[in-house]
Amino acid sequence: MNHSEQLKDVLAEGCIIRRLEDDIYSALPDLPHKHLYDRRAAAYDSVVSTWLYNRLMWGTSPLDYVAFARAASISHPAGRMLDAGCGSLLFTAQVYLASHRQVIAFDQSLQMLKRARARLIRLGGSVPERILLLQADLSNLVFRPGRFDTLLCMNVLHQFAGAAELIPKLSGLLVDGGQLYLTSLVSNGRYIGDRWLGTLYRTGEFVRPRSGVELRNLLEDTLGEEVSYRMKGNMAFATAGC
């Protein structure tokens, strides 16, 4: 089954797939698309990848994100996995290359997807047939319900005002018994992190910061079930069965 056939199996009926470049496809309309991160993809990666930035600003480490992604990847032996808002696969490329699962990784930024492709090639020599890179909009999900065994959405919710609407839509893409893995920055009384969250909110980078308790309540209200939830510094890590 080629890439187009694999994508048609999970995309909603009538959704048109376009091949943009080698190993990159799009489910967006055939119109010019400019995304905020197209202009800053390289700068974003160079900062966010560092131990110093994560430790100082958020009280975390890049290894925390890699470990969380690995937990999502090994949560099912072979089922299909969706990475929603995948960025450049900064913390996930090595995890996906080490897995045998089919992974569909989507982001609205074409430049981020190009960096994801380059990262996979640099680390693995090529983009495996089972890893599909798709340009798609998180605000307008184009996937069929019940098509994924695992869904990972890392570092997205703090940029998404309509999280209460998004979370159940993501959950609906999972098969019965599927697993949802989410991370988000939250305010929690940590001075440096909370101040920086406020700055990013005022500059329009993030939505209004949610507190750790607020996010936990939101997840429990929208998913309607027990959520495994923990915080490290300003980062919340949540897992839920659906």
Annotate each PLM feature.
Residues 181-236:
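C-terminal alpha-helical "lid/dimerization" subdomain adjacent to the S-adenosyl-L-methionine
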Residues 16-75, 94:
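Conserved class I S-adenosyl-L-methionine
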Residues 155-156:
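Short catalytic micro-motifs in class I SAM-dependent methyltransferases
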Residues 2-19:
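Short acidic, Pro/Gly- and aromatic-enriched capping/linker segments at domain boundaries
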Residues 164-176:
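A short glycine-rich, Lys/Arg-flanked "PGG" loop and its adjoining helix->strand segment in the class I
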Residues 152:
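A conserved beta-strand element that flanks and buttresses the S-adenosyl-L-methionine
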Residues 238-242:
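C-terminal lobe and adjacent flexible extensions of AdoMet/dcAdoMet transferase-like proteins
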Residues 82-140:
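Class I SAM-dependent methyltransferase SAM/SAH-binding core
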